[in-house]
Amino acid sequence: MSDENVLADLAKAVIVTMHQIPQLEQLPVHELQKIPLGRLRRDATRLHAVCRYQKGVKKSEIVGPNDVRCVDVHPVALTDDWQRYAAFLLYHEFLHALGFTGHDRTFRNLEALWPDIEARNMGKSFGNHLRRRAAKCLWTCPQCSKEHPRTRRGMGRYRCRECRVVLLDVKVGP
């Protein structure tokens, strides 16, 4: 199945789940299906998903889904291993689309209502996965064997935080 189909199916499932959350009853959840969905660049390592607003709309003036230009999700999140996390990402971005622009207490309380607890906690491992995928070398501590994936070589300029030993550059892949 193509990424577009996976994304559309996930969005439908997320909207159905959002309709079942009582705290979201008063919000225009049905309008979320009108928001165009897209993908981030494959080489993005820090951004997992984003809610992009219409040009000229200030974050403080956002009222609902009509102010949203599109929601983009990282294409790696649409693979089988990460689809549960992709569903949570869509939920997170749809909350932004409903007018909760910041990550304040209200937003975090609504975000915590997502039923898949494990998916809510997959962000750190997904970020590590993206960084490891993009890494050209690993800065490795010869003493404690801790690895730090990087795109540039360290050239002996960096030390391990715990051991204070100079990190070695280990080339990754072919």
PLM segments and residue spans:
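Active-site-proximal or metal-binding-adjacent scaffold patches in catalytic folds
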Residues: 1-88, 97-174
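Walker B catalytic acidic pair
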Residues: 93
